[in-house]
């Protein structure tokens, strides 16, 4: 610390000294090597013009003088602008701009919606399988899923958004009463027919559907009986016509694990209709019909216990359908992904963690990926800095993050934030302060 005594007094010097003390406390566990770093920083500051020694330059100098830092970069998608992998690459570019020698562990995360398979594929050394299916409106498509060898055996990994996701239909086509999960069921049948498959993991989220999983169940072989015969295309618009369900014709299935990041039941004030149907195109006037359709499905199938399970309302009630018609278990999408990717060990090996998503707000605090990651890191004592498109006071005040940076803080218009999300995210990371205050 003797070297710091040579710093001339004057405006701005106090903040620099405070900043050095922050870095000193950050390094204080590493003995003589850190004492050397503090002295070296002081020597640099002695010869540096104060007016040019801004925080970003100081951070770069510190990074260059200290042992290589290891960063775990693990964002979720920035919906509408960046996939999880694209967000991770933008963050990595920001770190490398300041610290070219940083050790980076890039690990995009997902909650079960769009990008679930893409996130898992590299870490599991999985292979892609294609199969015929239909989209949320019943139109033929070519879809794909993953096959991967895991400690539990050969596993098929699907995401319902691959067939029945909102991304596959236009805004004008959104009509939850006319959508189907049949394509998801077709994928499940195809996956189950692969030799040696012992389980199917299915990510829920990003759905355009609201059929309670009835379309999926019909594809699996369940018969939905009406006064006019068998309805092989059940949708919310015609669920009320069902008089009975024949459960005796379902195809054989391996273990089914459904991954989701919501804990909503199927019905009621927190159910699929009340919470999620609006984003799929339903108006307030449509909601009573949609709620009654799901309630009728529960009654005619005697599925009351399944309807109350947390997560039953996921993906327009597909959570319920998987529980009741496929014998699935529902698990946290983050917990499942964490297990498959060995996330806890990767967190423990990092000096600092970067995460984020498009909207990091009060809803995220219910357990979405970045928050689950931050909570795990908090128990291990690893600091987490989050970046997002937009945030709120609840997320900022959660105490989970070393710092939280929102792109909207820049004051730029929304269209530019979306169009230039990647370079703006890179700039935000490069300018961020990763020192402990």
Question: Where does each model-flagged region fall?
Answer:
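Extreme N-terminal basic, low-complexity initiation segments
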Residues: 2-7
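Short, low-complexity, charge-dense intrinsically disordered segments
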Residues: 20, 30-32, 42, 46-49
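Polybasic, lysine-rich low-complexity intrinsically disordered segments
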Residues: 18, 33-34, 52-56, 60-61
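Short linear/disordered segments characteristic of secreted peptide precursors
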Residues: 8, 48-51
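N-terminal loops that bind phosphate or other acidic moieties
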Residues: 66-204, 208-437
